[in-house]
Amino acid sequence: MNAALATTTATTPVLRRETPLLHYCSLTTKSPVYQINRVRFGSCVQTVSKKFLKISASSQSASAAVNVTADASIPKEMKAWVYSDYGGVDVLKLESNIVVPEIKEDQVLIKVVAAALNPVDAKRRQGKFKATDSPLPTVPGYDVAGVVVKVGSAVKDLKEGDEVYANVSEKALEGPKQFGSLAEYTAVEEKLLALKPKNIDFAQAAGLPLAIETADEGLVRTEFSAGKSILVLNGAGGVGSLVIQLAKHVYGASKVAATASTEKLELVRSLGADLAIDYTKENIEDLPDKYDVVFDAIGMCDKAVKVIKEGGKVVALTGAVTPPGFRFVVTSNGDVLKKLNPYIESGKVKPVVDPKGPFPFSRVADAFSYLETNHATGKVVVYPIP
């Protein structure tokens, strides 16, 4: 999930291919004629704004009491999951002699307590972004929750002992960190971090950063506001589950509809969906209502554009764009987490952690295998990390 927004106007459709980039297009139509196969859009104007984005029920509870002290002796070496070649899950190796990263003046060193996996982790490991990736070998992982054990000289607000969470790579695909969160320690810039919400544990916190930043930025870029309606495709996924909650409980949506499989309909209702749609039985193109925004978190943009109102907007998590559309790379920003912390602490927004987890640190390869089935509910979390 990533983003680099650009603004353009044209009368041809935006098409997409599979990619973890987040896309945004504003569709304004005088006559809503949408026949994707024939590329006939009536009178259609598509806008893609340019800007960097930030790129997500209850979990099996991890203990909130974590015995980490700020003045603990920091070892020279640590355990970490590493891959030295691109490929399948089998390239992942648990190493015990990885050097603990040195911090820069604007960074803190975090003793990692929990981490989470995202689809972009798998695609990166498969080599789909090798042109812009950091050099191998790689310690994967974007999402982290843990305790600050060392601070750089230019760090202003954080101190040793603070419990924090973040997406550790400012840009998920453009030179992401070589040493990510699937390790005992990781170095993170202060600007990417926020204090962990007090009411959730580390495992729950680890499941939030990349997904909730993606969800929020999509809503911001579509100018979503009180009184508007939204349809979320894949409402039980890591990002979709948070889009439902933010739209309903933070932005004041007049109506939230969401698709899910039969067994997950009650979950999306519990998160705030007014209408839960069983995608195994219903076709969204046949829905009687149109929506101000469609948030496509599954890769069905061709159908998404058929259920928006005149002037409505679509956010797509998968697919690339042919001109005049533009991809935009989601970037991490601790300010987004700080903005949303009050809603998390009030219980209005809840982390959704897949019930098959958390996976212990020794089973990271199994966690990836499960993630790549594309059947996870919410986020796949790794906890505890020794």
Swiss-Prot record:
One of its GO terms (molecular function) is zinc ion binding. Optimum pH is 6.0-6.5. GO terms for cellular component: apoplast; chloroplast; chloroplast envelope; chloroplast stroma; nucleus; stromule; thylakoid. CDD domains: MDR_like_2. The keyword Plastid applies. Keywords: Chloroplast, NAD, Oxidoreductase, Plastid, Transit peptide. It comes from the Eukaryota. Its main location: plastid. This is NADPH-dependent alkenal/one oxidoreductase, chloroplastic. The gene is AOR.
